[in-house]
UniProtKB/Swiss-Prot annotation:
Enzyme category, top tier: transferase
GO CC terms, sorted: cytosol
EC number: 2.1.1.-
Its biological purpose: Specifically methylates the N7 position of a guanine in 16S rRNA.
Protein name from the UniProt record: Ribosomal RNA small subunit methyltransferase G
A single MF term (Gene Ontology): rRNA (guanine-N7-)-methyltransferase activity
First and last residue of the signal peptide: none
Length: 246
């Protein structure tokens, strides 16, 4: 996907990209590739692949969720790595207030420099583990209108990382590259236990490559019990499952 095609494809979805925003994406691409030589940010470095599989993929939620386009949502991106999906969404929709959480300080340093160079405001960067970020008595617990995650972890693990940070009435949006038929069913217990309720699983394909993608949207319908998230490492080693599933 060339930058020109990126702009044209978004326009088909009634999203206009200004020259300033296009320049910001170009700076993003250049800094991503340059920094990646020293810090492991991405395996994808070819320009057209970055525009498709990082930039377009990251803004996909805005094609389906009007609130991201029109409201000043307070969103949190957990395990954002090189800033995906939150920073591409922030570039297109500057009214969003973004908090990015990542456990690797080198990635946070990259994002600090990038955010400054892009001239973005209302972006907070937090160096922390997902399991610690939203524990009881931490200032970020149940504070966000929306929490996003673009990760390969199973949904029952992502739910424990992300739902505790979502305020009641907010949403958790998982961007999944692929999803087994059973993954959501296996995550149902975790989602309910953590105060969530599955709203929708939107399946779509990336343009040009037809790579499958899923947006899993979970409403936060009640407060997360105090004991979640569990201590660092436990959600991955012992994902939440109903007793009969174990």
């Amino acid at each position: 996907m060339t930058p020109k095609t990126f702009v044209a494809t978004l326009k088909e979805h009634q999203i206009d990209v200004s020259q300033k925003q296009l320049d910001q994406f170009e700076i993003y691409f250049e800094r991503l590739v340059a920094t990646n030589q020293n810090v492991n940010l991405t395996a994808i470095t070819e320009k057209e692949a970055v525009y498709l599989k990082h930039f377009f993929d990251s803004v996909a939620p805005t094609l389906y969720l009007e609130s991201l386009r029109t409201m000043p949502l307070n969103i949190c991106d957990i395990g954002a790595g090189a800033g995906f999906p939150s920073l591409p969404m922030k570039i297109l929709f500057p009214q969003l207030k973004v908090t990015i959480v990542d456990s690797l300080n080198k990635r946070i340093h990259f994002l600090e420099e990038l955010v400054a160079e892009l001239g973005l405001t209302d972006v907070t960067l937090v160096h922390d583990r997902a399991e610690l970020f939203s524990q009881v008595k931490r200032p970020y617990r149940e504070q966000f209108d929306m929490v996003t995650a673009r990760a390969v972890a199973p949904m029952n693990v992502l739910a424990e990382f992300c739902l505790p940070a979502v305020k009641v009435g907010g949403q958790f949006v998982a961007l999944k590259a692929s999803q087994s038929d059973t993954e959501l069913a296996e995550a149902a217990f975790a989602i309910e236990t953590l105060g969530g309720q599955l709203k929708e699983d939107i399946a779509f394909n990336l343009p040009e490559t037809n790579d499958p993608r899923h947006l899993v949207i979970i409403d936060k319908v009640q407060s997360t019990p105090d004991k979640y998230p569990r201590r660092a490492g436990v959600p991955v080693k012992k994902p939440l499952m109903a007793k009969e599933e174990k």
